[in-house]
């Protein structure tokens, strides 16, 4: 059964199975400790796959009532990548606890990024705070994000007046996430995302700061609060008819 399941995922996602037990965690033992703590709380088996054309460096997914699996763009080896694996386990952990996630209404995999970035605005800081409290180096993790995401924010989008609603949603959710994450590390490094937004997208930056205030006022310590926040965010960003909070 397990072999058939692995082969099915390989075919469906054009990915290759990766044996996580062979991975060397000596570079990041705190990531391993966090993962070991989470994995005992998961009710389904988890598998790993390498998918070179993955739009993100990693993505955790669920085959309902059957298993979890994590897609990775490449075989992990660095300390930062091990932290990222721990982060994906965090998503699975909170999913088991009933925390919400955003899903595309029509279910098209091609549009999954629109849903993911909504979820990440609330859930990523929640998970990264856990990692930080567990002693993982999330500054290293965030510096990698700067290289990838800040460059896209600076050069990958047009001026504000030419943004479509999906681009505005992406930028706003990204800034909401990064403001919270820099609060976790007490601004130990410059928040390049805010600096770029202050130059290019002042209105979005203002909206993002206001939404972070709403997050802080509401709290994220239970699934209901997080669902309420994500529903407010989709409505505010004019995509509530396309993105469902489940």
Model-derived features: positions:
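Short helix/loop segments within enzyme catalytic domains
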Residues: 129-157
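Non-catalytic, well-ordered alpha-helical scaffold segments
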Residues: 83, 87, 124-125, 173
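Post-HEXXH active-site segment of zinc metalloproteases
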Residues: 79, 94-125
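Auxiliary, metal-adjacent structural segments of Zn-dependent hydrolase domains
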Residues: 2-68, 77-78, 113-115, 134-140
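Catalytic glutamate of the conserved HExxH
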Residues: 84, 88-92, 96
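Short pre-active-site segment immediately N-terminal to the catalytic Zn-binding motif
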Residues: 69-85
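Charge-rich, solvent-exposed alpha-helical interaction surfaces
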Residues: 8, 12, 16, 31-34, ...
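Pan-zinc metallopeptidase signature
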Residues: 149-246
């Amino acid at each position: 059964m397990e072999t058939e399941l692995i082969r099915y995922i390989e075919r469906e996602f054009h990915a290759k199975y990766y044996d996580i037990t062979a991975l060397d965690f000596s570079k990041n033992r705190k990531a391993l400790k966090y993962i070991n703590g989470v994995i005992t709380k998961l009710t389904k088996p988890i598998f790993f796959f390498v998918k070179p054309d993955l739009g993100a460096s990693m993505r955790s997914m669920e085959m309902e009532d059957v298993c979890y699996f994590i897609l990775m763009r490449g075989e992990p080896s660095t300390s930062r990548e091990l932290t990222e694996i721990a982060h994906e386990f965090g998503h699975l952990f909170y999913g088991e606890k009933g925390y919400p996630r955003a899903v595309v209404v029509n279910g098209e995999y091609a549009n999954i990024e629109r849903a993911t970035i909504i979820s990440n605005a609330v859930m990523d800081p929640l998970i990264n705070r856990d990692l930080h409290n567990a002693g993982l180096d999330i500054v290293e993790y965030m510096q990698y994000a700067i290289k990838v995401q800040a460059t896209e924010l600076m050069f990958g989008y047009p001026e504000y007046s030419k943004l479509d609603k999906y681009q505005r949603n992406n930028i706003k959710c990204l800034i909401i996430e990064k403001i919270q994450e820099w609060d976790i590390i007490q601004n130990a490094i410059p928040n390049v995302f805010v600096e770029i937004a202050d130059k290019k997208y002042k209105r979005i930056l203002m909206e993002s700061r206001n939404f972070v205030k709403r997050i802080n006022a509401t709290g994220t310590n239970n699934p209901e609060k997080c669902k309420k926040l994500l529903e407010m965010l989709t409505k505010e960003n004019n995509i509530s008819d396309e993105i469902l909070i489940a």
